[in-house]
């Protein structure tokens, strides 16, 4: 039972950190390449 409580307290924190860092990454990409439909480092 204690393990379940530990999981339920850790999972939201990790999820918040993950989505926060992902949002920050997307914001920075959109700041560097505004309105980009294709990114120059993905062109072949």
Swiss-Prot record:
The record's section on HAMAP family has:
PSI_PsaJ
| Keyword entries, A-Z | Chloroplast, Membrane, Photosynthesis, Photosystem I, Plastid, Thylakoid, Transmembrane, Transmembrane helix
Gene3D superfamilies per record: Single helix bin (1.20.5.510)
Q: Which GO terms describe its biological process?
A: photosynthesis
Protein name (record): Photosystem I reaction center subunit IX
* GO CC term, one of those recorded: chloroplast thylakoid membrane
Q: Where are the transmembrane segments?
A: 7-27
Cellular compartments annotated = Plastid, Chloroplast thylakoid membrane
**Function according to Swiss-Prot or TrEMBL:** May help in the organization of the PsaE and PsaF subunits.
> Which chain positions lie within coiled-coil regions?
none
Principal subcellular localisation of the protein:
plastid
Its membrane topology is listed as: Single-pass membrane protein
Q: Which organism is it from?
A: Nymphaea alba (White water-lily)
What family does the database annotate? Belongs to the PsaJ family.
């Amino acid at each position: 039972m204690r393990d379940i409580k530990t999981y339920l307290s850790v999972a939201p924190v990790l999820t918040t950190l993950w989505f926060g860092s992902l949002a920050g990454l997307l914001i920075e990409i959109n700041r560097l390449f505004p309105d980009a439909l294709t990114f120059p480092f993905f062109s072949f």
